């Protein structure tokens, strides 16, 4: 391959690398995921623990609708094994969902990444509630969870369940609570011993720079260093060519002629010298040298 073809290939590789590179540096911005918990069914004889509740919850990153995520929180760890059968019956009778909370997101569902929308993430956390303040199912929760995602991607996820206890039979009759819907827990009591709660969940997701992105940073640095070295080399080669051409131009002719050429140079010098001497002779001497012309 010629130098021109190699240069074109190198330029094409660099352009492709620059175009693909931003895809590897896309990091999910710190955002807030709003989950509106639609309803929770609690039996009248359900009792909470005194000091704290250890719970596990499963998030299905599977679009039920375009902008919806179903999130199921199990306050009772014993129900965790039967979460599929339990939450499948939530649209029907509420026999098996005494501690099942169903939430859906208001915003975009790709709050972690689009590639993980079909995976099931199991998250575990802890929730501490004082016994004397636990007068209703709605409390102020602050807990941290760690999703099980790909090993190349690491996330710190902090969930804040911000709500306020409120009881009403008709939610639309309270305009003051409509303004503070982000921090309001709406409770509606029904005759079938079920309580429907509407919550607001704020989830801040922060991305940590992983080894993959560090590798790409190093590759970018190496490419730039290579380009700088190549440019400096081309500049130095051009300067060397100019200096070499000037040195060849300034060399005397006698240095370039060798062997038989030196003899020709000496003969040439002798002829030039004799011509110069004859030109410098006076006119009388020139006449003496010339022979007389015979008369006809």
UniProtKB/Swiss-Prot annotation:
The keyword DNA-binding does not apply. Pfam families: TMEM156. Glycans are attached at residues 45, 156. The chain crosses the membrane at residues 5-25, 212-232. Residues 26-211 are extracellular. Disulfide bonds: none annotated. It is a multi-pass membrane protein. The gene is TMEM156. Keywords: Glycoprotein, Membrane, Transmembrane, Transmembrane helix. Residues 1-4, 233-296 are cytoplasmic. The keyword Membrane applies. It is found in: Membrane. The lineage of its organism: Eukaryota, Metazoa, Chordata, Craniata, Vertebrata. GO terms for cellular component: membrane. This is Transmembrane protein 156.
């Amino acid at each position: 391959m010629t130098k021109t073809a190699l240069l074109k290939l190198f330029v094409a590789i660099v352009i492709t690398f620059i175009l693909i590179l931003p895809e590897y540096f896309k990091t999910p911005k710190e955002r807030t995921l709003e989950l509106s918990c639609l309803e929770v069914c609690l039996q009248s004889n359900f009792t909470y623990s005194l000091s704290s509740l250890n719970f596990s919850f499963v998030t299905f990153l599977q679009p039920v609708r375009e902008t919806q995520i179903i999130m199921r929180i199990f306050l009772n760890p014993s129900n965790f094994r039967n979460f599929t059968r339990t939450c499948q019956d939530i649209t029907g009778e509420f026999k098996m969902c005494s501690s099942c909370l169903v939430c859906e997101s208001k915003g975009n569902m790709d709050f972690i990444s689009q590639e993980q929308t079909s995976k099931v993430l199991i998250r575990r956390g802890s929730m501490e509630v004082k016994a004397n303040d636990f007068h209703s199912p709605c409390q102020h929760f602050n807990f941290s969870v760690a999703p099980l995602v790909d090993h190349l991607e690491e996330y710190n996820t902090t969930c804040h369940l911000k709500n306020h206890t409120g009881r009403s039979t008709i939610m639309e009759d309270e305009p003051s609570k409509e303004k503070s819907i982000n921090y309001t827990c709406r409770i509606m009591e029904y005759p079938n011993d079920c309580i429907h709660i509407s919550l607001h969940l704020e989830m801040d997701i922060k991305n940590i720079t992983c080894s993959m992105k560090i590798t790409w940073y190093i590759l970018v640095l190496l490419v730039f260093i290579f380009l700088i070295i190549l440019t400096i080399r081309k500049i130095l080669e051009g300067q060397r060519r100019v200096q070499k051409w000037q040195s060849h131009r300034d060399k005397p002719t006698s240095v370039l002629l060798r062997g038989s050429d030196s003899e020709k140079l000496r003969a040439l010098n002798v002829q030039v010298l004799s011509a110069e001497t004859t030109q410098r002779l006076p006119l009388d001497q020139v006449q003496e040298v010339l022979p007389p012309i015979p008369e006809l």
